[in-house]
Amino acid sequence: MSIRCLAVLLFHDDEDLVADQIEYYKYKNNHDIIVFNHNSTDNTKYNIEKYSDDILCIYELSSKINFANHEVFDTIFKILDQNPNIKKNEIKISNTNGYNLNFKENYDWISFPESDEFLEGPDRKKTFYEYLCDIHNKKEITSIKYLTFTYWFTEKDDMEVESPVERIKYYCVNKPGDTSLYKTKSINGNSSAKFFTWRANKIEKTFFGHPKNNNNRNLLIWNTRHYEIREKKHLINKLKDRADNNNGCHHYKIMNEKLKTNSFYDLKSNELYFDDGINDLNMNEKFNWTKIYPYS
């Protein structure tokens, strides 16, 4: 079976992830791609444009479309819905037809991961795309929840390797500290279930993968690899940027304050599991993520 899949990618100062994201979703998982670049100050824009032939449309969002009140996400979901009520004068598009691509009609499945998230199926027997093909005829399935596996920089990382996905190999599952995935809350994790994938005609507005209503547990749970913090310099810059930026993720302010007095963000490889890229990810909660994240 062949199905039509779209990946929606949103970048903000993610110059190191652009190539990995496009390679993973387009070439390893048979997705078409649209890209939103929000007010990046590094080389993200340049790196995106290098792959312009691989992207259906690039949407450059100005700083006047901000994260406050979820405006960035509102804009993206309105474009997916072909809702004209957006600030078009604050958006530059690479494709003149960028507002008329009929996403809901032209695609079977749409995924909108975070820029540092790499979506997988429930295990590694098949690719993400192959698992989407498997469930396509199960009409009762309209969306997919994801369990987070957090990857972190360690002393084992070879900084000569540019690709974060190739360089960072140590991780631990971060199970929800709520009941969004399982009946029992985790005491070592404090993530929440994330919705990143929907049938194209059933897409639901989210904020960084979090829907307004996350009460209904869905038995279909897949995995996502989350490379949020990729080196010490990146940690410092990201926490400072997000702490000063009203993007709705208030835990960055708390983390930034802790960074000034603590060094516990420097994890050792033996605190985590090694990912060989072949075997299934380990579900055991070896590391207590509540030491890192005050809440999610």
Locate predicted features.
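N-proximal low-complexity "stem/linker" segments adjacent to membrane-targeting elements
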Residues: 1-23
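Short, acidic, metal-binding catalytic loop of nucleotide-sugar glycosyltransferases
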Residues: 23-31
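Ser/Thr-glycine-rich phosphate-binding loops at phosphate-binding pockets of nucleotides
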Residues: 24, 36-44
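Short acidic/polar active-site loop segments enriched in Thr and Asp
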Residues: 31, 108, 142
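Short beta-strand/loop segment that forms part of the nucleotide-sugar
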Residues: 31-39, 59-63
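Active-site acidic Asp-centered loop
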Residues: 38, 113-115, 122
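Active-site-proximal specificity loops/subdomain of glycosyltransferases
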Residues: 45-112, 120-121
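Catalytic-site signature of metal-activated, phosphate-bearing donor transferases
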Residues: 69-74, 84, 90-97, 121-296
